[in-house]
């Protein structure tokens, strides 16, 4: 896929899954990602905050092989060097990470660059700086980070969906139980962490979420 085709996945009804071994109830990131991909997910973000860099490298190499096998995107959280070394599809950076312009200069134009945003001002700044997509949230309370950001609610998400030209990935506390609230606003690409990785049956849970997304895409649900 070229970059334009990759970005289409972020614009469409897709599940965007993030790794989080800490919440994977004893399962390794590799095994979790394999199940997620087998279930049909096309976007994986490798997010691992606590492991040594060498361990992250060996892990992300294996995940890159898996995503290539399943023709899925691999986005690496934070690490520009890992992104480039393993030839991932892109990087996702936070508000306190490298500036977008630095990431663009280091990686080049063929890599996708996503940015975490929490406010309208940050969203507009992401547009000005040339982000390829934004992650907007946390929509609901989320505790996967050591210092979680307060939930921003659905109002900003509603505004972004109606006013932003680049893909908006909704993230933060999204579950099977509240996903319809997000999709009814017009959101398409939905990020999930613990709802997937903490599920006793990752494959089954992932298929359920994909089925819901396909229902909206095919008009089964009226937004």
Swiss-Prot record:
Catalyzed reactions per annotation: 2-[(2R,5Z)-2-carboxy-4-methylthiazol-5(2H)-ylidene]ethyl phosphate + 4-amino-2-methyl-5-(diphosphooxymethyl)pyrimidine + 2 H(+) = thiamine phosphate + CO2 + diphosphate; 2-(2-carboxy-4-methylthiazol-5-yl)ethyl phosphate + 4-amino-2-methyl-5-(diphosphooxymethyl)pyrimidine + 2 H(+) = thiamine phosphate + CO2 + diphosphate; 4-methyl-5-(2-phosphooxyethyl)-thiazole + 4-amino-2-methyl-5-(diphosphooxymethyl)pyrimidine + H(+) = thiamine phosphate + diphosphate
Keywords: Magnesium, Metal-binding, Thiamine biosynthesis, Transferase
Pathways per UniProt: Cofactor biosynthesis; thiamine diphosphate biosynthesis; thiamine phosphate from 4-amino-2-methyl-5-diphosphomethylpyrimidine and 4-methyl-5-(2-phosphoethyl)-thiazole: step 1/1
GO terms, biological process: thiamine biosynthetic process; thiamine diphosphate biosynthetic process
EC number from the UniProt entry: 2.5.1.3
InterPro entries per the UniProt record, alphabetical: Aldolase_TIM, ThiamineP_synth_sf, ThiamineP_synth_TenI, TMP_synthase
Binding site residues for Mg(2+): 78, 97
GO terms assigned for molecular function: magnesium ion binding; thiamine-phosphate diphosphorylase activity
Top EC category: transferase
CDD domains (alphabetical): TMP_TenI (cd00564)
GO cellular component, one term: cytoplasm
Stated family: Belongs to the thiamine-phosphate synthase family.
Known function: Condenses 4-methyl-5-(beta-hydroxyethyl)thiazole monophosphate (THZ-P) and 2-methyl-4-amino-5-hydroxymethyl pyrimidine pyrophosphate (HMP-PP) to form thiamine monophosphate (TMP).
Protein name: Thiamine-phosphate synthase
Provenance organism: Dictyoglomus turgidum (strain DSM 6724 / Z-1310)
